[in-house]
């Protein structure tokens, strides 16, 4: 594979070796000052990838019931990758967001609705003008319940697209969560630190039908 292949996922055998040292990040979330790493009792975690993680993270931190968010890398092979390595296409990772949420306030189903309605899940290894395997659409469930909900929601959204006259197939990857690696601190809450920064996400005008 070419070092700059942007359309095909690297194999585990060809992925970069990475490192053992985790990426240093701030202790507290820049927006709400909650812990960036701890998960309070009763809260749960979700992982989504839907393009450039700057806009995705902001989308989720604004939701009531979301305790914290973090930008990072998921679904790949290279341990503790850097942003530059992920952008090379040689780690297998997608730009992803870790969401810690209170299920008593916001459900996983509501997070899935936000996911489907705010990006284009048909574009394969890109999202809008952002091209590369790191920009693929993906859901990384942590439990059998999350996995079942993710698959069911994909079927409902595909049906809703068809009903709206959009016959493109969904390319969203749904795979059991592998280790999530935090991105460099400069990427955390990027659009809070840089309010006029780039945000490349946007929906296709289709709503996710409710779970029957």
UniProtKB/Swiss-Prot annotation:
Active site (catalytic residues): 52
The UniProt GO MF terms for this protein read: L-methionine-(S)-S-oxide reductase activity; peptide-methionine (S)-S-oxide reductase activity
SUPFAM superfamilies given for it? Peptide methionine sulfoxide reductase (SSF55068)
Which reaction(s) are listed as its catalytic activity?
L-methionyl-[protein] + [thioredoxin]-disulfide + H2O = L-methionyl-(S)-S-oxide-[protein] + [thioredoxin]-dithiol; [thioredoxin]-disulfide + L-methionine + H2O = L-methionine (S)-S-oxide + [thioredoxin]-dithiol
InterPro entries the record matches? Met_Sox_Rdtase_MsrA_dom (IPR002569), Met_Sox_Rdtase_MsrA_sf (IPR036509), MsrA_MetSO_reductase (IPR050162)
Look up the record and give one Gene Ontology term from the biological process aspect: cellular response to oxidative stress
- Return the EC number: 1.8.4.11
Supply the Gene3D superfamilies for this chain: Peptide methionine sulphoxide reductase MsrA
Query: Which UniProt keywords are present, listed alphabetically?
Result: Oxidoreductase
Enzyme kind, highest EC tier: oxidoreductase
State a GO cellular component annotated for this protein.
cytoplasm
Biological function: Has an important function as a repair enzyme for proteins that have been inactivated by oxidation. Catalyzes the reversible oxidation-reduction of methionine sulfoxide in proteins to methionine.
Family note = Belongs to the MsrA Met sulfoxide reductase family.
| Protein name as it appears in the record | Peptide methionine sulfoxide reductase MsrA
From which organism does this entry originate? Salmonella typhimurium (strain LT2 / SGSC1412 / ATCC 700720)
């Amino acid at each position: 594979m070419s070092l700059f292949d942007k359309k095909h996922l690297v194999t585990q055998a060809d992925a970069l070796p990475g490192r053992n040292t985790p990426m240093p990040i701030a202790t507290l979330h820049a927006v709400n000052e909650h812990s960036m790493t701890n998960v309070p009792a009763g809260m749960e975690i979700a992982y989504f990838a839907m393009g450039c993680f700057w806009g995705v993270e902001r989308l989720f931190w604004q939701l009531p019931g979301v305790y914290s968010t973090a930008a990072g890398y998921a679904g790949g092979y290279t341990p503790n990758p850097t942003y530059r390595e992920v952008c090379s296409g040689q780690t297998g990772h997608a730009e992803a967001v870790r969401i810690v949420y209170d299920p008593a306030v916001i459900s996983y189903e509501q997070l899935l609705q936000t996911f489907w309605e705010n990006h284009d899940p048909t574009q394969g290894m890109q999202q809008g003008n952002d091209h590369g395997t790191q920009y693929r659409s993906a859901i990384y469930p942590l439990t059998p319940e999350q996995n079942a909900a993710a698959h069911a929601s994909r079927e409902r959204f595909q049906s809703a697209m068809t009903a709206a006259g959009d016959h493109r197939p969904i390319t969203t990857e749904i795979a059991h969560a592998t280790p999530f690696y935090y991105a460099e601190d400069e990427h955390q809450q990027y659009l809070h630190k840089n309010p006029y920064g780039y945000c490349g996400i946007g929906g296709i005008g289709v709503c996710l039908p409710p779970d029957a």
